[in-house]
Swiss-Prot record:
This is Olfactory receptor 1078. Its main location: membrane. Glycans are attached at N5. It comes from Rattus norvegicus. One of its GO terms (cellular component) is plasma membrane.
Amino acid sequence: MDSSNRTRVSEFLLLGFVENKDLQPLIYGLFLSMYLVTVIGNISIIVAIISDPCLHTPMYFFLSNLSFVDICFISTTVPKMLVNIQTQNNVITYAGCITQIYFFLLFVELDNFLLTIMAYDRYVAICHPMHYTVIMNYKLCGFLVLVSWIVSVLHALFQSLMMLALPFCTHLEIPHYFCEPNQVIQLTCSDAFLNDLVIYFTLVLLATVPLAGIFYSYFKIVSSICAISSVHGKYKAFSTCASHLSVVSLFYCTGLGVYLSSAANNSSQASATASVMYTVVTPMVNPFIYSLRNKDVKSVLKKTLCEEVIRSPPSLLHFFLVLCHLPCFIFCY
């Protein structure tokens, strides 16, 4: 297309859930509540793991990292949407949009890699219990998390730079509540085939390889569990990875469901609604899944909350710590 028909983009319009103005207060309250529950729930998991030396193990080290990433993940999209609803202004700057895309991709990939590492951790714990502490030493745990960050940062940076190279036309409305990469690419006024090809190739590569690792880990885990003779032993072995399996299923099923629904349905509103499942709901329910299914986390949360309640004198910090543990504490009973 001729360069005269291109424009220097300064901002985009996030249409989000603006079709019905009467529902804006309800949507604002709902997303604010989910955001607060997510942040408080994941902070409570992190505080519980840090405060109890018994939880200073590889499994909980990875869980605390996952909770931190989930806080960052939901903070990438929801606060901007809440500000837009509050100010009745759906504008996001070009720089803000690219930045949002970068952090969105960064934390999605980190979630992906951390879930894979946690699957490997469960594989070693169940299939090689006698060598667990030797294999999953602190150096390896730190190295795996560091590599996950490096790969995720480079991938997000690469995808963002690909976005920067795209020329955009005058139609700059994004039918989403955040700068979803696929929606932004559709606004380009040039042939984006190469960009689409590269972006989808890297996404498929970075999604299928970790997923294959998870499948392999659980294949070996199931094989080991089936070889256990006692029913109690089978239940104990399975219970150690039940929470992780639930989170993995939720993360991949919701993410896959979004893109399948987008391909089958041309409704942008339906795509935006479906994406709420993996961008908001998944980070919100993760701490509750681990709290409900994990006796160690439940006991630490109860113990920490009780200590904060009886501690005196009351202060703002005291109130905040109690508030952080309250959601998971309620669901633990």
